[in-house]
């Protein structure tokens, strides 16, 4: 035990193994769905790391990134940099979620939606933004078709908010 203790650079498994135990890791939040999405969309088997420090607009759909989501300390550092005045400007943060949280408290706007409706609001926003673009990418027709059912009215009804709130958020994102 003395040799194990004096070498503080031993990995936990080696240190615990020297004591006759085994390492058990437990994580209260399962990140496998996020990893699976990264594999499917980007071909990368890793958790994302977001650089909030360079953001001008942050819209979070239920991701409580300042409290429990992925790397809260890293996210808090970047958010503080983006949300503090930089060259006379600061990032705007909108939190779309059913409950007020630490992330929501730090938002410039909280859009309180019904639980489980965050994705519908995001899809309605994507539909609205894409349909109002004057110069959409050439291959946007398939995406337009997929999003056409997700109107601000449909999402607003499911989310328990006004459709105009969704439109206003889209206008702000586009800088109108």
What are these regions (language model features)?
Residues 1-176:
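Cofactor-pocket helix-loop regions in the catalytic cores of large enzyme subunits
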């Amino acid at each position: 035990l003395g040799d194990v203790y004096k070498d503080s650079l031993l990995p936990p498994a080696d240190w615990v193994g020297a004591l006759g135990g085994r390492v058990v890791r437990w994580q209260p939040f399962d990140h496998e769905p996020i990893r699976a999405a990264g594999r499917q969309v980007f071909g990368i088997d890793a958790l994302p790391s977001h650089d909030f420090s360079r953001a001008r607009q942050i819209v979070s759909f239920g991701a409580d990134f300042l409290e429990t989501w992925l790397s809260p300390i890293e996210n808090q550092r970047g958010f503080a940099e983006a949300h503090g005045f930089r060259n006379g400007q600061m990032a705007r943060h909108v939190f779309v979620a059913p409950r007020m949280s630490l992330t929501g408290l730090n938002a410039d706007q909280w859009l309180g939606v019904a639980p489980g409706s965050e994705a519908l609001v995001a899809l309605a926003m994507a539909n609205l933004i894409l349909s109002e673009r004057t110069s959409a990418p050439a291959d946007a027709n398939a995406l337009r078709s997929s999003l056409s059912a997700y109107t601000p009215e449909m999402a607003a009804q499911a989310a328990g908010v006004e459709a105009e709130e969704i439109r206003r958020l889209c206008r702000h994102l586009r800088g109108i």
